[in-house]
């Protein structure tokens, strides 16, 4: 649990300059071999720590967020690990946060059924969703997930609340110009419930990979590659940011 700048989620176009109480737990529903948070996601250490983790109730989290309002806190962000593996807890806590007039943020990999998203929709104000790549092979065989599920989640989330996306560029996996062009074109084509295009305004964060966890067989992504892919994405998107550079 930490009081973080909102930009750290990362959210660049949602209450910039504010702070948000950020909380996480243990576990994830993907198996990314390069996981940046493997200590709390799906490593052996994560499962060992989880057995002795502190338990916090929705009421306690809501009270903590309210107490921090005098430190520019605008609400509560579920982050660090994958929050949707415990979506009922997120729902119950977010309901209390909203009742207190505060904001709720979800940082997620988007690997969830749309029924879960609809259950959370009344209580979520912003999301940063990982769009980790744009090929089914990468999602299925490297990450252990489903690109189609994530695309459906993003498309609906963009109709519900403020959405920003993050893509970690891994050398030799999702770093081609063609893939970034296809991804950004798909994002730009997203529509609201009335059929109007909204995708061009969705911010995309393109981040640099560093070797860690089970993927140490390749170097960090070159900074110039990140900047070049950002320029490609800007062909279709208005707000493109680079990270870890």
Where are these predicted regions, by residue range?
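Glycine/serine-rich loop-strand microenvironments at binding/catalytic pocket rims
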Residues: 30-31, 150-167, 174
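Alpha-helical scaffolding segments of alpha/beta enzyme cores, especially the outer helices
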Residues: 60-63, 88-99, 115, 119-122, ...
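Short glycine-enriched, charge-decorated loop/helix-capping segments at active-site entrances
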Residues: 47-51, 140-145, 218-219
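Conserved radical SAM core fold
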Residues: 41-44, 83-85, 110-117, 126-143, ...
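Conserved Radical SAM active-site core
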Residues: 1-126
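Auxiliary Fe-S-binding modules of radical SAM enzymes
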Residues: 177-245
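Structural preference for beta-strand elements that scaffold enzyme active sites
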Residues: 73-77, 103-105, 126-128, 162-164, ...
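Conserved glycine-rich "GG(E/T)P / GGGxP" loop and the immediately following alpha-helix
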Residues: 66-93, 138-151, 167-182, 188
